[in-house]
């Protein structure tokens, strides 16, 4: 009885040779993403046990060392000057995150303090009015370090009047705008406020947009697709199906 015989059709072989490595690569990429997210969650958990420290007490300028560090800030919000981070959803409702400009008392720096979420007009015709606390405030929060350059749907119009709606928090791009209202130096990373602090709104920070388990699930999907493709390629390029059906009939 003849054994397994192979007969490769070049079009199918070429398509499989292109698709199969891509599917496998996507699976491993998702596993890498899962590992990154797990690392972020572990770093976040470790930071939560630390006591808040003044920004001036943080010796490192390495963004990875600063990420999620708990800080305490003393200063004054610049009245009437705040940013609205657009298209933020909370429990299915459209809104903005409100980012105030806090001039620090102990340095010549100003910090972007993300005060949390507020509902807003889905048509974007009316901007929410969200006054900041007046006078000196002391608050706590954590430093947020962006994982990379934000993706923008179009060029941001970073100019008065205030409040200014933005697509993403890019301190380098926002520095000229902040310089129109203060001579203080803009701190390179925003601070996300803790719940219950002066000026805090609806605070429900999302650590990652997809959990490590979700990325692992995506990886399994890609690997499954690769396995299915390889199996059907083998069926199409050999007499495997005939051998399987023959054995079943003989049984």
Which stretches of residues belong to each language-model region?
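Surface-exposed, charge/polar-rich loops and edge strands
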Residues: 1-58, 69-251
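Phosphate-centric recognition/catalysis
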Residues: 62
């Amino acid at each position: 009885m003849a054994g397994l015989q192979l007969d490769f059709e070049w079009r199918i072989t070429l398509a499989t040779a292109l698709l199969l490595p891509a599917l496998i690569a996507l699976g491993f990429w998702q596993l890498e993403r899962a590992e990154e997210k797990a690392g972020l969650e572990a770093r976040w958990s470790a930071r939560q046990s630390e006591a808040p420290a003044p920004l001036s007490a943080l010796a490192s300028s390495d963004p990875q060392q600063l990420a999620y560090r708990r800080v305490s800030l003393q200063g004054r919000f610049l009245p009437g000057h705040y940013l609205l981070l657009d298209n933020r959803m909370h429990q299915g409702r459209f809104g903005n995150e409100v980012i105030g400009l806090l001039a620090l008392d102990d340095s010549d720096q100003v910090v972007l303090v993300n005060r949390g979420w507020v509902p807003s007009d889905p048509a974007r015709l009316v901007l929410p009015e969200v006054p900041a606390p007046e006078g000196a405030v002391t608050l706590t929060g954590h430093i947020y370090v962006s994982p990379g350059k934000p993706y923008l749907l179009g060029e941001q119009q970073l100019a008065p009047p205030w409040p200014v709606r933005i697509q993403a928090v890019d301190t380098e791009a926002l520095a000229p705008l902040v310089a129109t209202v203060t001579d203080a130096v803009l701190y390179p990373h925003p601070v996300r406020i803790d719940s219950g602090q002066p000026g805090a709104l609806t605070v429900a920070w999302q650590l990652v947009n997809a959990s490590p388990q979700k990325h692992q699930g995506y990886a399994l999907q890609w690997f499954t697709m690769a396995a299915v493709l390889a199996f059907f390629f083998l069926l199409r390029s050999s007499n495997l199906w005939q051998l399987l059906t023959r054995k079943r009939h003989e049984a």
